[in-house]
Amino acid sequence: KKVNKLYCFPGNAGTAKIAKNVDIDLDNFKKIKNFILKEKIDLIVVGPEKPLVNGITDYLEKFKIKVFGPNKLASQLEGSKIFTKKICKNFNIPTAKFGIFTNERKAQNFLDKSNFPIVIKADNLASGKGVYICENKKTSIEAIKEIFGGKFGNAKNILIEEFLKGEEMSFF
C-alpha cells in the first residue's frame, strides 16, 4: 500500500519537511481519535512514552484504529523502572541487585549498607533524566532529596541499585 499523506502529532521543524504537523495535545485521546477518524488515517505509530504509558494504544484500538505501539501494561516496562525490575526478578532475568523505597528516610537508611558507586532512579517517566550514578553517601542523599522533592514529577517510589560497570546500550 502507498502512503499518500503523513501526519505528525505535534511534530517539529524536522517533521514539517516530510509531514503535516498537527497541533494536538497528546494527553487528549478523544481529540486525537476524532482527528484520526476525520482524516481516515490507516495506521498510527506512537513514539512518545507518555501517551503509551497512559494507554493510547488501548484507547484507539477500542475504536478499531490500527496502532503500532505497546499497550498500557506493556508500556509500563518503560514507564516504571520498578515494574521492570519486578518482571526481571519474577522471570529470573539477570539484573542489578536493587531496593525499592517509598520515602526519603528508608532510602537514606539503606545507604549505610551500600557499596558505592550506586545508581538511584526515579520510578516515573523523567525524559531520560531521572537516573543518578552516585559515588558516595552525600551525592546519594542529594539525589534522593531531588527525586522525592519533585524534580521529575510526583515520584512516589525510588529504585536504588548496584552499579554495573560496562557500556550502556538501548535497543528499540
Predicted feature residues:
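Conserved ATP-binding module of the ATP-grasp superfamily
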Residues: 43, 86, 94-97, 117-120, ...
